[in-house]
Amino acid sequence: MLRERFGVSERQACRTIGQPRSTQRLPARVVPDEERLLVEFLIAFSKQRPRWGWRRAAKQARRDGWDVNDKRVKRLWRLHGLRVPAKKRKKRLSGIGTHIGAMSPIRPNVLWALDFQFDTTVDGRTLKMLNVIDEFTRECLAIDVHRTIDADGVVNVLDRLAHVHGPPVYLRFDNGGEFIAQAVADWCRFNTVNTIFIDPGSPWQNAWIESFNGRFRDELLNLWHFDSLLEARVIIEDHRIDYNMNRPHTAHGDLTPTEFADKWRTEHQPQVA
């Protein structure tokens, strides 16, 4: 219109109105409704799971019924600036200790790993958490949250879990005072449970629980400021259930811990003659 009205060239007309010349040749791309809905899904996913990247977004999209491949999700994820901020890498310690494969379970309820984790409420008071996972299924069996937890508290958690799942064959933990206490030793002896103590200063020997701890802190503890012990217990228990039900693991063929455990038990049920 400007060219015809004022008799100027295409270059002059575009420069005057600040419009790229390419817009005169290529029609604007119409975004299909399906792609727009997919982008909305990815944006909502990134807000709900701020520490999960495009790979997990692609897996979740397919679990929710989207017919998409990784390449497309990656393109849209980066196009809309949904990248997860890179974490600073810590220097890894090296040492000699028990190889993690020396005791790798081949079925559920063989080996439970235990460890403590700490945080605070907004008033600065300590939150102490006892995390328990099944190393085979990767299920988080418990995250027990208190201000303090002693050996008797550990025994109470083990009693509760054994009542639901039965006692394990082994417990793996470090040499913390709560774990080496006589109360825990008595519980293990009474329930015929063996103990595996990792070497002092060797957290990599308890690799699965350390991996869980890292994800737990990255995906929840670093994002929340708890107002009270009660609030912490409610939110952390919700996270534990969500982790078991909705977090796929590559080692399990992208099944969640609960799905993997259910699948294993179904496939290994005694056959009725």
Regions found by a protein language model. Name each.
Residues 1-273:
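Charged DNA-binding/catalytic regions of mobile-element recombinases
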